[in-house]
Amino acid sequence: MRLTWLAALAGIWTVSYLCIRQYGKGLPGSLARSVRRAHRPIIALSLLACSGFAYAAQPLVDRSNPDQTVMDFYQVPYAENVVCTSRSAQVFPDTTAGTVSGTAAYRFRNTSGQAWTAAFGVNPGYTISNVRVNGAEVPFSVSDYQEYNEAMLEVALPSDREIELTMDYGGFPRENRNVSIMQGGTEISSEYLCLENAGLSPRLINVLPGENGYPTTIEITLPASMSVIPFGASKAEVVAEQTDGTKTWRYDSNSAGGILYAGDYIRQDIQAGGMDIEFYYGRKHQAVMEAAGAAEAVKSVVDYCTAHYGMLSFGTGDTLKLIQSRVTGGGYAANGASLLDEADFTADNLSDTGKGGGAGEVMIHELVHQWWGLGNMFDASDESSLWSAEGLTVYTTYRIVKERYGPSYAQEHYVDQWQQAVDNYYLNFYVRNPDYLEALPEEERLEISNSLRYVRQYCEMPLKILKAEQLVGGEEAMDRILRGLFNRELDPMYPYLTYQDFLNACGLTEEDLNLA
């Protein structure tokens, strides 16, 4: 993408140079005079053509269907009377070139007595080769059609009862073009690595698991400075050390896909909330994390939130991995593991007084999002709404700080600051005169709107929750209400916690929580 823009801007600049006014002539005359020297227009056209070619063939982005409501790969019927009994992969990332190579093996039991076709999702940047069944080469094809960052690999398999399918794969993993403007998920470097599903090894699409699921063994070879963290309950162990300064890690899992993180991580083991927590963060953040009291913040949050709201649904009950990653958007969670956005733990974010009175309290705020935002999700489609994960997160942070430092500290650094910000909000010229806001240029309007929305979500909503606490009978009553909301039965079609859910649980109306 950088090459695309560099060539485009250089081409445009060259064209503008050709149009510099000469001999009192206008733009067309000056251009006609400049192009007499053939190399000038050739350079301009070459740069523009190079930009167009780079845009069309950029190696980092795939050609996934832009209509993300289409899920054709999930409509592929399962092979009849065929199960996968196990699978494995040996993965060799090149952290210098940013590429991946590997060998994958799949073992099937076919009781149909019929030949059949196995389907896999593969990263569009990978090339498939050396596909063999029980040692013999077999035909295969990779679709031109792509969706959700996958192309479909189809392999013709015989009617044999026991089948071992092996294949080699490798290349530069491409990003989904539908999210290419966001921070990349797939990354391969000596500092950080993330391989998800088809980026790790071809993902099996149309074969059901055997009686033991999809027993999986993954081996990955990386520089010795990197630690491997499977996303989930699996534990990775070093099984070999090579003379070239690399280590081979191995772990077992049970799924058709899988996600793996690796990097120059520091691990801290913390006991909190009845769980053993493995807290992983990048070595480059060590000074910031230690200054913010990260380990103490994790313990405080997990102890408090587990006692008041309940266990996280994505923990195993005994262990939980908290992994700092470069994922954007707040992270995600699965059985036994959860992500923390790297951007939440920068020095700039940890000094944001809107989230807490100091770096340690901002750390608490970000960790509380494991309960409000990840453990319970919020619909963020209405940007004008003051109801979001931030309201309950800021309120919970206030309660934890109040418990740790006392009511006076919490009142001064939280409630009083919320009230001051809300008072200023309703005195704001653009709040009192929204027509003037709409008349501003878009860039200025968005900047002001974002600032105003911040006040409503981070200050006004916590004040409303605090008022609700007083109306329902105090902190213990509010804790019971929030615990019930956190552990409620979710609607799979709309799993979000809404403002109306909160009001109903409190037995209140919107008018009851007006601050005026």
Regions found by a protein language model. Give the residues of each.
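Amphipathic alpha-helical substructures
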Residues: 287, 408, 454-516
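Zn2+-dependent metallopeptidase catalytic core
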Residues: 104, 109-111, 118, 156, ...
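A surface-exposed beta-strand-loop module
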Residues: 115, 125-185, 241-248
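Acidic/His/Gly-enriched intrinsically disordered linker/tail segments
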Residues: 390-463, 471, 492
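N-terminal, polar/Ser/Thr-rich
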Residues: 28-101
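Extended, low-hydrophobicity, Ser/Thr/Pro/Gly-biased non-transmembrane segments
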Residues: 59-63, 168-264
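Juxtacatalytic substrate-recognition/specificity segment
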Residues: 148, 218, 271-381, 385, ...
